[in-house]
From Swiss-Prot:
Homodimer; disulfide-linked. The keyword Signal applies. Residues 23-44, 218-302 are annotated as: Disordered. This is Stanniocalcin-2. It comes from Macaca nemestrina. The modification Phosphothreonine is found at T254. Keywords: Disulfide bond, Glycoprotein, Hormone, Phosphoprotein, Secreted, Signal. The lineage of its organism: Eukaryota, Metazoa, Chordata, Craniata, Vertebrata.
Length: 302
């Protein structure tokens, strides 16, 4: 079913591609200018390109990098897949058994996904580009790129070239994934890219590395502020202890006041005040007991 649909689509695309130049000479449809044509090609894959890629995908073999070569020359400027494939194959002998298995399975996964998804995707360049990068990430993660990189770090580092990061987005996507594969892999790749950058750009790379270190500095700030937080906690604890010791002199004064009140004839509720001062604040229950005593006292007087 899918093969039939691809065949019909290719035939229709080829027919439309042959009709399109003749339609541009019609009096009611003036030919497009160079700017319009270039902007249209950048925003959408041309019908001729679509038909060529479809034809290439059908004829490409399952082994090798033929499927990825189909995307090298297109108006959406999606390049780099073929280069990554060739780099992996050329360095496959340097990998251990796990690394070789990863290369075989990941390349096969990417080729299979490209062949099946391309016919179902829009011709808009952003949609095609996102599809390519998404399936690439899926295949790398599915077949455990990080495990292969951790066991073959030296070979992985040798495969990464600074100039490829400037020209091909799939390389950037691959390196970004590798940077998440642990500190050892991350440090090795970062050092290699910085050295290559200095060889190509000279002192400009030193400026970029300085900016990067300045950006990465804020996360180290919290440990420096930690002693201040500890000092603040100690200060609060000191004030808390002082607060706990404050009631002692007040209780003594309350005791002295109670003795003085005992010696003099005071109002009946002075006893209640002395009790509140000696035992601390009692809340609603203390006030209700005092009211009960007052009511009993008034009943006796009656």
């Amino acid at each position: 079913m899918c093969a039939e649909r691809l065949g019909h689509f290719m035939t229709l695309a080829l027919v439309l591609a042959t009709i399109d130049p003749a339609r541009g000479t019609d009096a009611t449809n003036p030919p497009e200018g160079p700017q319009d044509r270039s902007s249209q090609q950048k925003g959408r894959l041309s019908l001729q390109n679509t038909a060529e890629i479809q034809h290439c995908l059908v004829n490409a073999g399952d082994v090798g990098c033929g499927v990825f070569e189909c995307f090298e020359n297109n108006s959406c400027e999606i390049r780099g897949l073929h280069g990554i494939c060739m780099t992996f194959l050329h360095n496959a002998g340097k990998f251990d058994a796990q690394g070789k298995s990863f290369i075989k399975d990941a390349l096969k996964c990417k080729a299979h996904a490209l062949r099946h998804r391309f016919g179902c995707i829009s011709r808009k360049c952003p949609a095609i580009r996102e599809m390519v990068f998404q399936l690439q990430r899926e295949c790398y993660l599915k077949h455990d790129l990080c495990a292969a990189a951790q066991e073959n770090t030296r070979v992985i580092v040798e495969m990464i070239h600074f100039k490829d990061l400037l020209l091909h987005e799939p390389y950037v996507d691959l390196v970004n994934l590798l940077l998440t594969c642990g500190e050892e892999v991350k440090e090795a790749i970062t050092h290699s890219v910085q050295v290559q950058c200095e060889q190509n750009w000279g002192s400009l790379c030193s400026i970029l590395s300085f900016c990067t270190s300045a950006i990465q500095r804020p996360p180290t700030a919290p440990p420096e502020r930690q002693p201040q937080v500890d000092r603040a906690k100690l200060s609060r604890a000191h004030h808390g202890e002082a607060g706990h010791h404050l009631p002692e002199p007040s209780s003594r004064e309350t005791g002295r006041g109670a003795k003085g009140e005992r010696g003099s004839k005071s109002h009946p509720n002075a006893h209640a005040r002395g009790r509140v001062g000696g035992l601390g604040a009692q809340g609603p229950s203390g006030s209700s007991e005092w009211e009960d005593e007052q009511s009993e006292y008034s009943d006796i007087r009656r």
